[in-house]
Amino acid sequence: MWDWLGRVGVNTGLALARVQAQARTLVLARVQVQVQTQTLARVRWRGAVCCLLGLGVSLLAGVGFIGAACAGGAVVSDLDVIRGGDATDGFARALVPRTFEFPHDHGPHPEFRHEWWYVTGNLDAADGRRFGFELTIFRVGLVPGVGAGGQPAGVGGAGSRVGKTAGDVVGGVAVAGGAVAPGVAAASAWRTRQVYAAHFAITDVGRGEFKFAQKYSRDALGLAGAQGEPFRVWVDDWVLGSPSPLPLASAVPARSPSQAASAMQGDPTRGAGTAGLAPGLPWTLHAEGQGYELTLDAEPLGQPVLNGDHGLSRKSAEPGAASYYYSIPRIAVHGKVVRAGVSSDVRGLAWLDREWGSGSLGAKQQGWDWFALQLQGGSAFMFYALRNHDGTRDPNSAGTWVDPSGRAQSLTSDQVTIDVSDHWTSPRGGRYPSRWRVRVPAVGLDVEVRPVLANQELGTQPRYWEGAVDLKGAREGHDAAGRGYVELVGYGE
């Protein structure tokens, strides 16, 4: 949970990663790397909320080890950076609004400490079965610095550039001033300055099953990585990205809540007129685990929407306690779900969230409740309620309303009322909200939101709840219904 990834070191998104790095000098001719995730929590900053990432990393690297850099004979530990210390040291921070360009911004931003690609959705099978799914991939920078072309300087996945600079990590050892630490092979293929983690979950509503799996790896030897054009991000064989190389598209601006957007051509609920709306798409998605395999083709039904202040999503009043955050709230998907060798054709609606930054959750903040609701008729609602330790809502909580034409409207904390009417107690411990009434008078929304299954908790460390929901109620005096996803962080500790 990346970055988590959500958003990493999150004062507003990342409740920061706890990284256990064991440095061991191996008298081996080959480098053995073992990345173990004990606490992988979504370092996600969901829209403005960042997630807790507990990344338990054990990097055993030949003659070198993670956590130390040699500079003029001095050994400097990098563990403070990994654990969060001052998570922004050396990394870029989200301070002011920026210009978004697509497809470039679908790809990685290695100058920031963390980011994530987050997809959720609801699917219907031809035989009447229903599924919910989540695939999230997190990138976490271990040390700051980028190489040529704005990419990580080390030799990594397909998205990396060759070329080494000061601060490169060689065999797990940070190199200062371009000089390799004694005894470390400069050309080590295991060198990396970032790690990736992924969460996959599927809700089989008819069977009453919820299954989740996770993977983690380093950006080396093609084990994990990300690239911008054509877009692709992967951890092992879990992947999100272009099905094949696409011609580079010209920069296309996204829609921000303060900009009036022209209406989409065709029916936005059916995907007509999507050409050029989200350059770089369509994409494919693949993941499998715990007896389920999911393969989908995805095509947007609208342009990317910038959340917050033209894409700058603030989590607290502290400078840099923010992320850059955009969403594609309606994506048509179709493909297959395979369980026990039996394949079901499915189609449905998904949601993409993208965030990157270098901040973390504030000292007063405990977690967040994130809502992504897709209403019949084409509108969408996103809101993240940041929770303080005393149970109050942080005033930096915020959201976005998107009407059927694609026009977006920012929502402040005082414009959204969320009342909890039921709870669910996890067998692992922890009590989660389990039914909500969501009211947004500014857009005439008043709906009840219910999980399709009570238990949609991912037993990662830390644990969190992320699940498919139904909604029913009224919008501007008319009946309203739809589906969506809710994320609950900070309840299962």
Task: Walk through the language-model features, giving the residues of each.
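The N-terminal extracellular segments of secreted preproproteins, especially immediately downstream
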Residues: 1, 44, 49-50, 69
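Structured soluble/peripheral alpha/beta segments that form catalytic or ligand/cofactor-binding pockets
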Residues: 2-6, 70-493
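Intrinsically disordered, low-complexity repeat/linker tracts enriched for polar/charged residues
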Residues: 10, 14-46, 253, 265
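Alpha-helical hydrophobic membrane-insertion segments
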Residues: 12, 48-52, 166-169
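Short linear/disordered segments characteristic of secreted peptide precursors
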Residues: 26, 38-42, 56, 162, ...
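Bacterial N-terminal signal peptides
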Residues: 48-67
